[in-house]
Design a protein with these regions (language model features):
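Short, Lys/Arg-enriched N-terminal segments with co-localized hydrophobic residues
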Residues: 1-16
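Surface-exposed acidic/polar loop and edge beta-strand patches at domain peripheries
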Residues: 17-182
Length: 182
């Protein structure tokens, strides 16, 4: 079903997929960030950063067959670090706002980091969109994982989040989210 035809090129159940990893830049804190390029046999591709689990490019043929990027992305690490819109990113622990930055769970009140006036937005001051994720290539998929520790941004419990990206010969992007908490 599976064999590696060359470095980072895979044939999985008869489908060719090329996955490459390149340096993208360095964060303000000195962490190296990589960009992953998933390309099908027709040459259409997606690019994903391990910083914020961000989609950077989706290049597919337009109606005339010309390769066209249909994803709103940026070109530099500093642009992503200063991005208030979370372009292409996985946000969290919560997407959107938590009014006044607090909630009650099982009778206990939790106070979260506030970053939008008095509100908590998209995970707080350092949400998932602003972190490096661990990345690995498995078969024809890119798997990104991060751990949010108990107390991070004020949230209770440890959380492990895994996001798996796939890219098909039909130019279909698949994204699978899996989370577990204690």
């Amino acid at each position: 079903d599976y064999y590696c035809s060359s470095a980072n090129s895979y044939v999985w159940k008869g489908v060719f997929m090329k996955i490459t990893k390149s340096d993208f830049g360095t964060t303000n804190t000195g962490e190296n960030i990589n960009i992953y390029h998933l390309e099908n046999e027709a040459g259409a591709y997606v690019e994903i950063l391990n910083f914020g689990c961000r989609l950077v490019k989706i290049v597919v043929p337009d109606r005339n067959g010309n390769p066209t990027d249909v994803c709103l992305g940026m070109d530099t690490m500093s642009a992503y670090e200063n991005d208030d819109a979370s372009l292409g990113a996985v946000v969290g622990r919560v997407a959107n706002r938590i009014k006044d930055g607090h909630f009650t769970l099982n009778g206990k009140e939790y106070h979260l980091a506030v970053n939008c006036g008095t509100n908590h937005l998209h995970g707080g001051l350092i949400g998932y969109a602003s972190k490096p994720w661990d990345a690995k290539i498995k078969d024809d998929k890119l798997i990104l994982t991060m751990i949010s520790a108990d107390g991070e941004e004020g949230y209770p419990g440890n959380l492990t989040l895994t996001v798996t990206y796939g890219w098909s010969e039909d130019n279909e992007l698949s994204i699978v989210y899996e989370a577990s908490a204690d």
